[in-house]
């Protein structure tokens, strides 16, 4: 059983409704943009201009890459920095139809997997570490798994 989401468009910026952009604080925007392009086939929409960050489209999400920095008027107490690779508090989760095929393809393109795919909790999953230390979960649900 699949779950269908009704939305007419996933444009950025959205003309109606909502589109989600995942913001990653990275050490090197060029390196990170090229990584997501090479490994996962992300489409680089813009590399930014020094004032605006790069935007990428990856499957049904948008990604923003930025080097971060100190507080700004709209976030006066927040500093953005790359993560400590061993203490992560959020991560992307890629749901795939064929985890073994993705594992082989992405590994051949330079993805650094923490482990091979492992069966766990109604799915098979594994994790990738990107150049800045973020982890990305890759998971395939078992055929009998039900959403919702």
Across the structure, where does each feature detected by a protein language model lie?
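Short phosphate-engaging motifs
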Residues: 31-32, 98, 102
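Conserved active-site tyrosine of GNAT-family acetyltransferases
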Residues: 32-37, 106, 133
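Conserved beta-strand-loop-alpha-helix junction that forms the acyl-donor binding cleft
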Residues: 23-29
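Short glycine-/small-residue motifs
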Residues: 137-138
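Vicinal oxygen chelate
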Residues: 2-21, 43-94, 101-129, 141-148
């Amino acid at each position: 059983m699949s779950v269908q989401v009704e939305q007419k468009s996933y444009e950025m910026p959205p003309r109606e409704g909502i589109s989600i952009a995942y913001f990653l604080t990275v050490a090197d925007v060029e390196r990170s943009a090229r990584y997501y392009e090479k490994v996962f086939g992300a489409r680089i929409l813009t590399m930014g201009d020094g004032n605006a960050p790069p935007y990428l489209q990856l499957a049904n999400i948008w990604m923003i890459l930025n080097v971060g920095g100190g507080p700004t008027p709209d976030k006066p107490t927040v500093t953005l920095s790359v993560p400590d690779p061993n203490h992560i508090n959020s991560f992307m989760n890629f749901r795939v139809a064929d985890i073994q095929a993705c594992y082989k393809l992405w590994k051949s393109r330079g993805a650094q997997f923490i482990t091979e795919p492992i069966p766990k909790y109604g799915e098979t999953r594994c994790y990738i570490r990107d150049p800045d230390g973020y982890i990305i979960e890759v998971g395939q649900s078992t055929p009998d798994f039900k959403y919702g």
